[in-house]
Amino acid sequence: MLVLLSCAKTMSAVSKVKVPLTTSPRFQKEAAEIALQMSQFSVDELERLLRVNAKIAVENYKRYQAFHAETTPELPALLAYTGIVFKRLNPKDFSAEDFGYAQEHLRLTSFCYGLLRPLDVIRAYRLEGDVVLPELGNQTLFSYWRSRLTDTFIEDIRSAGGILCNLASDEMKSLFDWKRVESEVRVVTPEFHVWKNGKLATIVVYTKMSRGEMTRFILKNKIGTPEELKGFSWEGFEFDESLSDERKLVFINGMGE
């Protein structure tokens, strides 16, 4: 089974965690070209393009200006992203075996690097899928990547057993020809809901935390089938058979009943 996670907006360039090996991103050339185009924008332009405040725009202006320098720090992707999902995944205590398993069974989306393996070394950046770069065909990055990633993604899923556990946010489907993905491999999407005022609700922060915890559960326990995945339990979230089906595994937290 292959797990798909979304990239995070927040990144670090420093980590004390040791990994057994590192690899180069498979779409390094494309990433370098995208970063080069992004380096042409001013701070004000980045603020508008990325819909961020001035401080974040300045930070990413500096990142893009230094992106191609030999001295710019790099980190394995699994350590570089620092959002809620990755904090809960918490690879700090991963063994060499855990990292090796993750390399084969986890993929991370990236608007700059396309599709990443956990040990692919990357540089910090900030980007959105709806950014249009005229030099790359005047199309959104979603469109730019779709034709480039789909074959590789399907091959990765097949190599990992032919089942995709989709723990990425919904917008990431647009990076791939998703209909083709669903027609060629089995896709299972876990959902996380809580009872609130007598109704089922989706709370974003709980969803992100649960995605990270589930990914950790899969990698640490070498979970290979949706049936095994039903055994996931965390902070009150339990599998609910009545709300689930072949494509959707629903986990419910009854704290607000």
Curated annotation (Swiss-Prot):
Coiled coil: none annotated. InterPro entries: YaaA. Pfam families: H2O2_YaaD. GO terms for cellular component: cytosol. Belongs to the UPF0246 family. PANTHER family: PEROXIDE STRESS RESISTANCE PROTEIN YAAA (PTHR30283:SF4), PEROXIDE STRESS RESPONSE PROTEIN YAAA (PTHR30283). This is UPF0246 protein BT_3869. It comes from Bacteroides thetaiotaomicron (strain ATCC 29148 / DSM 2079 / JCM 5827 / CCUG 10774 / NCTC 10582 / VPI-5482 / E50). The lineage of its organism: Bacteria, Pseudomonadati, Bacteroidota, Bacteroidia, Bacteroidales.
